[in-house]
């Protein structure tokens, strides 16, 4: 799931499945990846992402559950790195093991050998900044699997009616203004803006922010996949997804195949809907349907919708804007 941080030129990637359908320009914006677990359908895209990372200056952080550092080391060790010293690549890998986060960094200058970093305590939050925080919960899929919640600190938008009444022509300046507001940098710098009557007006960033910027509580996205429907899993997933604006949740099986879902440590569509309802999620996006339901996808969505009692949507093939 590619999550775009709107107006930031940055994004977050949840899981590393097949990435061939995602444009490279989008993947190059990714700054953090959370891999829920390393079954092939969630980790096969690691090499694709690594290849794109080699020539870029920005550090990429990849987080996974216990045992993840060994999996990453195995992937990287499969290649020969004798010509890598001049590449700027910096890949930080970290795993959540109990109450500890263990990390290493791979650098081109270090010929992609893992360099240990200091351990830090695991508090449930793996990243926090002015724009958003990333929360994870360790769930059970027969192996540890991570549930993820991305929580925007504050949502910044534009009052389009006010913009129109001021006769201002929308443009790149709007993105720059929102970016400045998020970072508390909307000061006295002047901006010249074209008007709809072919004129021009001059404002400071602070004046514009006061006139057209709207502030509201931040949006919440939760991502839960590959878990068994047990009391402990449900309690943890519900808390993680509490009041989410959108819960992206696996619906691998129809409830008629609940025994099979339980045997394979997956959710049914009905269970996904029940989980979303218990969490108070505003919308539910079921995904990760078993291939056995090819041609019956609508049945899966309908079952989830009935249990949820709220809006159910289908994501695009790759992304969610935030």
Segments predicted by a language model, with ranges:
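Metal-dependent catalytic neighborhoods of phosphoester/phosphodiester hydrolases
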Residues: 48-52, 80-81, 294-303
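Binuclear metal-ion centers of metallo-dependent hydrolases, dominated by the metallo-beta-lactamase
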Residues: 90-104, 211-215, 231-322
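Active-site-proximal loop/helix segment associated with metal-binding centers of metalloenzymes
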Residues: 103-234, 239, 246
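Active-site neighborhood of divalent metal-dependent phosphoester bond hydrolases
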Residues: 59, 71-119, 292
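Active-site neighborhood of phospho(di)ester-bond hydrolases with catalytic His/Asp-centered motifs
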Residues: 14-16, 31-41, 65, 222-228, ...
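Active-site metal-binding motif and surrounding structural segment of the metallo-beta-lactamase
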Residues: 18-64
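Conserved beta-strand hairpin/beta-sheet module of binuclear metal-dependent hydrolase folds
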Residues: 1-27, 32, 59, 148-150, ...
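Short, surface-exposed connector motifs at secondary-structure boundaries
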Residues: 30, 55-60, 218-219, 279-286
């Amino acid at each position: 799931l590619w999550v775009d941080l709107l107006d930031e030129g940055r994004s977050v990637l949840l899981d590393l499945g097949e990435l061939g359908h995602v444009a490279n320009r989008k993947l190059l914006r990714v700054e953090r990846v959370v891999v829920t677990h390393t079954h092939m359908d969630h980790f096969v895209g690691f090499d694709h992402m690594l290849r794109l990372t080699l020539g870029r200056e920005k550090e990429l952080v990849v987080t996974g559950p216990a045992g993840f550092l060994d999996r990453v080391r195995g992937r990287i060790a499969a290649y020969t790195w004798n010509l890598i010293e001049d590449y700027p690549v910096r890949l930080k890998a970290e795993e959540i093991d109990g109450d500890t986060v263990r990390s290493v960094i791979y650098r081109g200058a270090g010929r992609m050998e893992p360099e240990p970093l200091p351990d830090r305590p695991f508090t449930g939050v793996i990243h926090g900044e002015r724009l958003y925080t990333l929360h994870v919960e360790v769930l059970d899929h027969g192996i540890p699997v991570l549930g993820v919640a991305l929580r925007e600190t504050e949502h910044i938008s534009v009052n389009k009616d006010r913009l129109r009444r001021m006769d201002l022509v929308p443009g790149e300046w709007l993105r720059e203004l929102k970016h400045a507001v998020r970072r508390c940098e909307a000061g006295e710098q002047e901006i010249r803006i074209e008007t709809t009557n072919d004129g021009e007006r001059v404002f400071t960033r602070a004046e514009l922010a006061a006139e057209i910027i709207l502030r509201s509580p931040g949006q919440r996205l939760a991502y839960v996949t590959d878990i068994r429907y047990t009391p402990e899993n449900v309690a943890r997933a519900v808390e993680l997804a509490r009041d989410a604006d959108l819960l992206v949740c696996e619906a691998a099986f129809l409830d008629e195949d609940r025994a099979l879902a339980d045997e394979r440590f997956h959710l049914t569509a009905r269970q996904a809907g029940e989980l979303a309802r218990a969490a108070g999620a505003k919308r539910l996006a079921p995904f990760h349907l078993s291939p056995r339901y090819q041609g019956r996808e609508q049945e899966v969505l309908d079952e989830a919708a009935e249990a949820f009692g709220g809006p159910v949507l289908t994501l695009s093939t790759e992304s969610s804007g935030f």
